[in-house]
């Protein structure tokens, strides 16, 4: 500012620099200051710092003041400052800033509002410089909580770390708190760093600076069917006053508290649901807890309903809730003692077994192990099972009666070779080797007795390896194997030509049956032929006492075919082709069956080894194996067939032509006869037609006249009927109209009469009401009163006129002239007497 005269208003100030001494001083208004030549005004007058109520400001590098509050000056006259320090100033008179002082501005504002601490809130503050407050000294680093509601008065030695909100603790909840340092809490309980505890007091809880809130713990509602399993993190005494060891588990139930809040050193393991048992249920508890609270590992406890309980820690129910075993009349339980105990009056040793037969309800005891629930096995007369005695090892079969296993008996499984199992499931007990299933799995119940249906005219050999002897069963029959018996499996040749082991079978068909085979033979002139032979066979056995020789030859088909083929080859080798071709059947039959002493061919071929008999042999085909020979033979045969066929065709053609000529002659003769009959019939028809035309001509005119007369009669009759109908309709219409008019007039007359009656009744009622009204008025007013009213008018008029001095009066509008001559007397009325 360059003006020499400076006008400083009230509550304004300037800084004047003395250029000679380089000292700056402050001048406050109101004043008019004349600046000297060696002085410089550093800035225009500016307002003083004003701090309103409930506000404060921070001044940096404040000036030093004396005990009386005056500003302390240095020897040079400069204001002495506390450099690097700050000063908080509250409401008061506006003050100037001395040279060197600065106003600390936050967010562009130098004056700040005092902070209000609301309820359930606190300020976490920290001392950054030692200071003395009243009678105590506060060291740097000290922290404390300023709780609301109040106004926070700031200090330069104290900084606000954070604003802390109180945590509300609701019913059935608690606050988990941890100590940061060693201290004594507000309840007077000493705490060490890292210690945790629960604050259970309801309401708002404002933590101290030595505490850390870890969270709000929600309580668990307990009931008769719900408990809480807990585990101790460290050794401590719980809220119920019980000492707990680290790692220990226990349960809290409704008997302890309706609501449990997990403590700081407790861990929730699980919610435990109650086990409810009905009268028909029980459970087996493993590792039960004794009266001291310890588990008896390895032991079991049986509980039967009706009851409700909780499983204690360490207890398990591997099998869950089980139904009481209801043992029926045809059932039993196999039991085994696991330890020595007394069952009623009987002493049971460990390992001893016994059976309990129904009907009853059974619950296993701790000392007893349930081995098996057995039932009576119902068996038909053709059903059975294998049973083994576990004491002696004897195996037997039970057939055709219901059976219950005894204590020392078990079902014995009879295993058969896989090939036999597959044959048992085949339809007829036989199967082709090429059709065997490599992945076959038997579905037979092994303890069921092995059964096989022997077909009609078949036999099965069963071998008992314990007795070392077989038995033969003839069909139709049902075979049941004893425990030590096995089937004899037949392996037969099959196919054409025969291949060994092509067919496996459990039963031997006794025949009569047939078999076919193909063999190659060579004649004496070296012609090779392929023969297809079929032969019938059967087994000649005694059904009352079948012989074992029947099954002595395992492959009787292959043996028979080989024997027959050998005989046929030998016989054909002695014949040339032409001779064999002409007499093949006879040569083969003679070779196979042989001849008797008389030289005749025998009827059959018998194999004495197994009583196998071949009764007939048939040559189905015979053809050379060489292709050229076969073709030439076929051509010669075809040529012979053609010659025979043509001769037969010629004979047939001649016979047909002869029959055709005879048929044509008969046909022509029949045609002539038919024409004669037709002409005769035509003549008769013409005669009848002439007669018909004559009758028709005479009767047509008569019919027409009759028809016209009949039509005229019908027309006249219909017109008469129509006239009658029209007259009847007109009469009905007139009568209806007359009746309608009469009804209308009657209704109108009735309406008029009723209307008149209503009017008369209304008039009569009105007159009566008026008369009654007048009568009642007269009665109410009275006769004397009426007389007085009647006289009151004239008397009043007379008095009015007398008072006015008038004899009469007339009222008019002035527009209508009135002739008053002779009318005055009438208008005034009678004179007063």
Swiss-Prot record:
It comes from the Eukaryota. One of its GO terms (cellular component) is nucleus. InterPro entries: Band_7/SPFH_dom_sf (IPR036013), MVP (IPR039059), MVP_rep_dom (IPR041139), MVP_rep_sf (IPR043023), MVP_shoulder (IPR021870), Vault_2 (IPR041134), Vault_2_sf (IPR043179), Vault_3 (IPR040989). It is found in: Cytoplasm; Nucleus. Its main location: cytoplasm. It holds the Pfam family Vault_2. Keywords: Cytoplasm, Nucleus, Phosphoprotein, Repeat, Ribonucleoprotein. This is Major vault protein. It comes from Leishmania infantum. Gene3D superfamilies: 2.30.30.560, 2.30.30.570, 2.30.30.620, 6.10.250.720, 6.20.380.10, Band 7 domain, Major Vault Protein repeat. MVP repeats lie at residues 54-118, 119-170, 171-223, 224-278, 280-328, 329-380, 381-433. The vault ribonucleoprotein particle is a huge (400 A x 670 A) cage structure of 12.9 MDa. It consists of a dimer of half-vaults, with each half-vault comprising 39 identical major vault protein (MVP) chains, PARP4 and one or more vault RNAs (vRNAs). Required for normal vault structure. Vaults are multi-subunit structures that may act as scaffolds for proteins involved in signal transduction. Vaults may also play a role in nucleo-cytoplasmic transport. Disulfide bonds: none annotated.
